Amino acid sequence: MAVPLNLAVETEKAQALLQTFSTASLFASAGLGAFCFVADHFLTLPFIQHHLWLRALFDNTVHAIIGLWSWAIVIGLRKKSDFYEVILAGFLASVIDLDHFYMAGSLSIKAAVNLPHRPPLHCSTLIPALCFSLRLLMWACRLKDSWCSLPWMLFISLTSHHIRDGVRHGLWVCPFGNTAPISYWLYVTITATLPHLCSVLMYLTGTRDMISTKHGVAIDV
């Protein structure tokens, strides 16, 4: 009986992995890439460029939408709590821009966008460090499996933000400095495929199994 049971479990896992690339998720990813293109084009319009606060607000809103959209692709939207999760993902993708004001020591938007160097949360080396630290903290606090997706949510929110910023500034990889700016279409491609990469990594680490139990169904993203 053990062999058929194990085979059934492995078959279910394989099906869950294949569902990561379902038709619905691929359409959602294509929509995410299209949104990036349209939103970035909108940001270049003169009435946006001539108002610093408006430009910063819209740019930050785009970061938030990309973050929540990406996480929605990962987990799917099946019940009310899923919407709370994607909103949190959008918030995390957006809130890191507050470090501009921290670095500027002022609420002046002009000072915040004209810093001598990049603020701390824009160091890409911090992403794996923060995600791993959060995972260790959750383990130390013995949090329930229902919280197991938090490090991955943080990963996709921060990474999507950094990749988008990388078009203009490259990635800041401490202690090695900045990379060359990321080409625009590479940024769009990475952003659209990042949810699927995240899903595969979650599958390989067993996180998707715990989330499927939490959601009560096999996740189809």
UniProtKB/Swiss-Prot annotation:
Taxonomy of the source species: Eukaryota, Metazoa, Chordata, Craniata, Vertebrata
Domain of life of the native organism: Eukaryota
Keyword Transmembrane helix: yes
Protein keywords: Membrane, Transmembrane, Transmembrane helix
Membrane topology field: Multi-pass membrane protein
Cellular location(s): Membrane
GO cellular-component term (any): membrane
InterPro entries tied to this protein: TMEM267 (IPR026572)
Organism encoding this protein: Danio rerio
Transmembrane annotation, as ranges: 28-48, 57-77, 86-106, 121-141, 182-204
Protein name as catalogued: Transmembrane protein 267
